[in-house]
A protein has these predicted regions:
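Extracytosolic ligand-binding ectodomains
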Residues: 2-6, 14, 22-422
């Protein structure tokens, strides 16, 4: 029987499964089944990106016909957002991770989108020897000490093993690159805002530290209460400071749309003041929510970890075209990284298959896959060939810079690649 891949909410029954382009019978699955769990927001402003990442995993698994080394792959999609807020919720993320590790067929956990959510789930998957692969988390402290809080990343590794992997560069690279770009663009004074969340404050802190090192004056690095609809009090301070750049560490759900709209309302517009942010803002939903008039008025710049789709070559270019053909739309920012993570997992299962078959229990199966992922080398990825280092990070640091320009269509503007950043 063919089953379609479906998204299920965090409280849905564990039995809601999906087999990608495969047939769940004993002939096609001689060695049984393995399950991959995904977890990120699938509602509110995050629904387009969440769907894009889900599609990316789907793409990677569908390339195998749903069967790897005699094992049928089933994908269980979970939503870690709260129905009340539409944003990620720590309690929901913990429930998702616990649901995955309690499933004797679960082999890998794919997620999260928000770095704060990863802080919740990594220790849970680590205790279960389950590999966790993220398509989007970039907070440095999840894997390394640079740019991290005290105790990180060890506090996320209760077993002492590295089980968390990300095929995307971390913010200690992106935040630094953003500050250097601002310096090269000729900005004289920057006012940093952050959403006081793990990702947003983390990248803002790295931007600040780098700016001070390279001689770019920083007026302040101020945390905002992003739940407040009126950000004009802080923007009035920004205007009085004389800063010619506002840098905001955050994501689209945590105040960026309001900040940009109200920057225009208080006169913080180009050429007097411009706006820059990290890849957590590289979403069409930002343009819709902030309005193109406001975005264009601030002459926005956004940094992104990796290459823009149109600049990819080889595997990246092929994946981009395959995604568009399969889903009839452009990939979202992290959709191809979800595909990359899925392919890493498929490759690891192939290499670990003999150990999985000999394993005495699910912990040994998971450990075999974890070790295989950790040993990933010379992987032909969307941004070229790369390796995982001892922290579970990729060893490339390609970054891109985007601006926003006018465009035809219902939105009225779009992100456009501007430069490769180093």
């Amino acid at each position: 029987m063919r089953l379609s891949r479906v998204a299920i909410p965090a409280l849905a029954l564990l039995g809601a499964l999906a087999l990608i382009d495969g047939t769940a019978d004993s002939q096609q699955c001689p060695k049984g089944k393995l399950r991959l769990y995904t977890s990120w927001p699938m509602q509110g402003a995050m629904l387009p990106e969440g769907t894009g990442m889900k599609n990316g995993v789907d793409l990677a698994v569908s390339e195998t016909g749903g069967v790897v080394a005699g094992y049928c792959l089933e994908v269980v999609n979970l939503d870690d957002a709260s129905p009340q807020t539409g944003k990620w919720d720590g309690a929901v993320e913990a429930e998702n991770a616990n649901k995955a590790v309690a499933d004797p067929l679960a082999i890998v956990y794919i997620g999260t989108y928000n770095s704060g959510a990863a802080k919740v789930s990594i220790p849970i998957t680590n205790r279960a020897h389950m590999a966790q692969v993220t398509p989007a988390n970039t907070y440095p402290g999840l894997t390394k000490k640079r740019g991290a809080a005290p105790g990180e990343p060890g506090i996320y590794r209760p077993t002492g093993l590295v089980n968390y992997f990300r095929p995307i560069p971390a913010d200690d690279i992106q935040g630094a690159v953003g500050a250097k770009w601002a310096k090269r663009m000729g900005f004289k004074k920057v006012y940093i805002l952050n959403d006081q969340e793990l990702y947003g404050k983390g990248i803002a802190d790295v931007f600040e530290a780098t700016a001070k090192t390279i001689g770019l004056p920083v007026v302040a690095n101020e945390g905002i209460d992003w739940k407040q609809p009126d950000q004009k009090p802080v923007l009035t301070k920004v205007r009085a400071s004389g800063a010619d750049l506002v840098y905001m560490g955050g994501v689209i759900e945590t105040g960026a749309q309001v900040i940009i709209r109200q920057m225009k309302e208080v006169g913080l517009v180009a050429p007097r003041t411009r706006f820059m942010g990290p890849d957590g803002l590289l979403e069409e939903e930002l343009l819709k929510g902030a309005t193109c008039d406001a975005v264009l008025a601030t002459d926005m710049r956004i940094t992104f970890a990796g290459l823009p789709f149109e600049k990819m070559r080889g595997v990246g270019a092929k994946t981009y075209e395959t995604y568009k053909t399969k889903y009839g739309k452009e990939p979202t920012s992290y959709a191809l990284y979800a595909a990359e993570g899925g392919r890493v997992i498929v490759d690891a299962i192939k290499r670990a298959a003999p150990q999985i078959e000999k394993a005495k229990d699910v912990t040994e199966k998971r450990e075999a896959v974890r070790k295989a992922i950790a040993s990933t080398k010379n992987f032909e990825g969307i941004n070229g060939k790369w390796n995982f280092d001892e922290n579970g990070d990729v060893d490339y640091d390609t970054m891109s810079g985007f601006k926003v320009v006018k465009a035809d269509g219902p939105i009225g503007c779009k992100f456009q690649f501007e430069t490769i950043l180093e």
